[in-house]
Amino acid sequence: MELIVYLRCFRGIVLREALRFVHQKERFFSALVRPLVWLGIFAAGFRSVLGVAIIPPYETYIPYEVYIAPGLIAMIQLFNGMQSSLSMVYDREMGSMKTMLVSPIPRWFLLISKLLAGVFVSILQVYAFLIIASLWDIVPPVSGYFTILPALIISGLMLGSLGMFLSSAIKQLENFAGVMNFVIFPMFFASSALYPLWKIEETSEWLYYVCFYNPFTYAVESIRFSLYSQ
């Protein structure tokens, strides 16, 4: 099969996801409001704290809002990966998935195209969040807006693949919505998104190992150090 056919298929799937995202305005606003609520309310509760140290020997502190911003970026990608997979379950129940499966394009290419389309949408959400987060004085270096892109692609692929795996195992829409919340919140809270690992190690050793082996922690840390060019 010619390469142009694959490219047209990929373009069609990406445009379909982009149009769905544009038409679902509540999805866009919820994707931004959710991390902004965390940033505006949760960070305000820790504003009295001098800061958080993340680089050994843990003597240099940064504001807490600056610390949790990468974790909130990863949260955007986590929710978007799950919601993109939720749309797959919806398409399967409504029967629209059959129109894609009857095409001569291999199914693995359809899945990869769907995954990359979700990553593209999540990156748009992240950059929109970074623009609004500047109101909280979260302004990374100019180079950070470029160096964060590979980290966003890798973490988006990882989190999107997790959601796609769940959507392939769970056939009903209602069951997937429940399992989605069961997966999202433990992954988010048991990571370095809100607290540095060395602080967690001081308070609970078993929780430290849970956070250390949590794949979401590595997504957060890759985003953090690429965003701030460190």
Q: Where do the protein language model's features map onto the residues?
A:
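Short, membrane-interfacial amphipathic segments enriched in basic
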Residues: 1-15, 206-217
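Transmembrane helix-boundary elements of multi-pass transport/secretion proteins
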Residues: 2, 6, 17-94, 108, ...
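Membrane-interfacial helix-loop-helix junctions in multi-pass membrane proteins
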Residues: 20, 58, 192-230
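Pore- or pathway-lining transmembrane helices of multi-pass membrane proteins that form conduits
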Residues: 29-35, 171-194
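Transmembrane helix-loop junction
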Residues: 43-48, 103, 134, 168, ...
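Hydrophobic transmembrane alpha-helices
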Residues: 71-81, 179-190, 207-209, 213
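Short helix-to-coil transition segments within interhelical loops
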Residues: 99-106
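Alpha-helical transmembrane segments and their short interhelical loops
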Residues: 107-181, 185, 230
